[in-house]
């Protein structure tokens, strides 16, 4: 277990300090592999009622390949900001993040597709855009097509005309098809449902050895999908890091009003302004 100071780097599954910790211990390590993601003086909005409120201490840390991180915080607005920020939907307040490889759109999201497209056209479009990710995928297009047909989602159907459950299945199947270098998982209600079980097993296979950042508080999801946890304060400060079970236990003992359950957590409020300025448009779709 380790309580961390401001500047940190993921190494061996633990956020390790690059500077003297509050306890006066110098923990200076290096990351051997090229990071899949690096934060440089990175800061986001962290209070939906105050557009000027950002991280108390900017992030400077690296995420190496293969680390699957659960970001644990009681600040639901910060969880949302982190996902849409990494997805490129809102800019940071300061700094930047850079990475080696492809960051996928939030898992289960619409991937920027026009709802008037047919299922087949959507698959063709994304396969063309993410051709390299499809080439390196351990899930075949035929596997996905078979599952879609079993869910009565036929290639000639228009996305807009699908039922809600069909849309959930379709969009999760798209996220499962491609081998991204970094996956973003904000919500897990459908992913952890019985209806999504065949896709869940494929996604678990797909993310093996790849990076993941998740903001769900579903305990079953965290234990199945994440290797490590990063506990944040309400202003984005890194409070603790470690193996996922340790991180969950630490958060339960030290974060006021924190709890995890087997049910879905936040339902993001689409009518709120989740951008980094008062004048920006609302972002409510992935």
Question: Where are the language model's segments positioned?
Answer:
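Conserved catalytic loops of ABC-family nucleotide-binding domains
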Residues: 202-218
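Conserved H-loop
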Residues: 217-225
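ABC ATPase nucleotide-binding domain signature region
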Residues: 62-130
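Asp-centered catalytic/switch region of ABC-type ATPase nucleotide-binding domains
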Residues: 225-227, 233
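ABC-family P-loop ATPase nucleotide-binding domains
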Residues: 45-47, 102-197, 201-205
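Conserved beta-strand-loop-alpha-helix hinge in the C-terminal portion
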Residues: 235-273
């Amino acid at each position: 277990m380790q309580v961390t100071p401001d500047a940190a780097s993921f190494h061996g599954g633990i956020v390790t300090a690059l500077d003297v910790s509050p306890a006066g211990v110098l923990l200076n390590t290096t990351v051997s592999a090229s990071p899949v993601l690096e934060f440089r003086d990175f800061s986001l909005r962290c209070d939906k009622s105050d557009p000027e409120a950002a991280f108390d201490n900017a992030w400077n840390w690296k995420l190496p390949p293969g680390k699957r991180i659960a970001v644990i915080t009681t600040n639901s607005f910060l969880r949302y900001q982190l996902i849409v920020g990494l997805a490129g939907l809102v800019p940071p307040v300061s700094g930047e993040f850079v990475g080696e490889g492809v960051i996928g759109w939030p898992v289960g999201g619409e991937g920027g597709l026009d709802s008037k497209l047919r299922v087949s056209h959507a698959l063709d479009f994304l396969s063309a855009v993410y051709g390299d990710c499809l080439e390196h995928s351990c899930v075949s297009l035929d596997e996905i097509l078979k599952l879609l047909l079993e869910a009565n989602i036929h290639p000639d159907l228009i996305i807009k005309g699908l039922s809600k459950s069909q849309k959930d299945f379709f969009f999760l199947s798209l996220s499962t098809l491609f081998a991204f270098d970094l996956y973003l998982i904000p919500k897990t209600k459908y992913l952890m449902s019985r209806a999504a079980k065949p896709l869940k097993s494929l996604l678990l296979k797909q993310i093996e050895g790849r990076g993941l950042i998740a903001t769900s508080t579903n305990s079953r999801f965290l234990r199945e999908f994440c290797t490590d946890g990063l506990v944040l304060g309400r202003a984005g400060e890194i409070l603790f890091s470690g193996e996922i079970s340790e991180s969950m236990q630490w958060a339960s003992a030290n974060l006021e009003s924190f709890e995890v359950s087997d049910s879905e957590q936040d339902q993001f409020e689409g009518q709120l302004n989740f951008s980094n300025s008062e004048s920006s448009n609302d972002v409510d779709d992935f």
